[in-house]
Regions:
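Intrinsically disordered, low-complexity, mixed-charge
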Residues: 2-125
Length: 125
């Protein structure tokens, strides 16, 4: 399968037929601009489940599960963000879905759920 977006990972392209998990780190001016709230709204409209939160580094971490097409739409939105945001970088890693999330919600800002981009070669910018 050829990935239409060259910025997305292609070596480990997820299967379009099975639910996937996208683990996304967004950097730039993404805190204090309603990024999490807007991302939650987008994810819910797309029928995705997961979480989003601010990180101490100034990034936003988002984990979403669902159909690949819906995840790709959410990632495209993440590259733009809400009007007041300035997105500099979006790093994405795909994994199989775990079905651990009952819905999509904002979590309190604490330590990241997984290592940040740059600490693992599994992330693609």
């Amino acid at each position: 399968m050829t990935d239409p977006n060259p910025e997305e990972p292609s070596a480990a392209a997820p299967s379009p037929s099975e639910p996937q998990r996208a683990h996304v780190h967004i950097s730039g001016r993404v805190q204090g601009v309603y990024y999490r709230s807007a991302a939650t709204e987008q994810a819910r409209v797309l029928g995705l489940r997961g979480v989003v939160r601010n990180l101490p580094s100034g990034e936003v971490e988002l984990i979403a599960e669902g159909p690949l097409a819906a995840l790709q739409q959410l990632i495209a939105w993440c590259r733009l963000g809400p009007p007041a945001a300035r997105v500099d970088k979006v790093a994405v890693r795909f994994d199989p879905a775990t079905d651990e999330f009952p819905d999509f919600r904002v979590l309190r800002s604490v330590a990241p759920l997984l290592p940040p981009p740059g600490s693992s070669s599994d992330y693609e910018a």
